[in-house]
Amino acid sequence: MGRVDAAALIQMGHVDAQHYLANATERGDPLTPETLMMTAAEPGISFQETMQGNFSLGATDPDAGAAAGQSAGTTLAIHVTVTVRDLDRFTADPNHNGSLVGTVDFTPLGLAMPAGQGVFRLFAPADAANTTLMVYELPFEHGGQAYYLAGAKRIHDDPGFDLWSDTTTLYTRLFEGSDATGKVVGAGVLRLNAAAFARVTASVRAVDASSPVEAARLIAQFGGFFARELWKSYAPGPFK
């Protein structure tokens, strides 16, 4: 516990590569030990999550895309490792930003397509009242074309018990290009079933913790934040 795993190393490599490309001169930088040294990372937590569901090219609305995908028998799946570092900053940030890397499976395009440094936000503000979002966004390429998969779980207390469906349903669109401003070329709804949710919970671990005590503290801090935000959204009015 607390050691750097493969997913964290990949993520750190992505960050350092992006920093290098953004700041490199035409002649590049010298290959000195200082240049090649990987950036030190703040301790945090990570977890792994797989979501899949019906998805269709040509659709622009997630529900319509899910219906079309069900009729055609086409599904899309994402397999991601989410990392949240510097939990004090994370909880203070209104958008609660983390990051993710992973792969995308979508038979019309390909399987295990690598997705680079993506966006993760937990309980981020939404335009609608009394609503927050769990945001998952992944850039990937296929056949020389850049794509951007953007999805959100909508956290909003409706009549009845909807906490489970809200936290396990990802409304997703596929954009051409490197961000969510491009043309929408597909849409669908991805879900997390009970077995997959149990695997998410079991995968939560501390990263770069200095000791088992710090690792336990990091996991407890993240778990406490998650529970408090759910309580704010779903607890009966007098108890919030």
Language-model-detected regions and their locations in the chain:
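Beta-strand-enriched cores of mature, soluble protein domains
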Residues: 36-240
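All-alpha RGS (Regulator of G-protein Signaling) helical domain and cognate RGS-like helical scaffolds
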Residues: 2-33
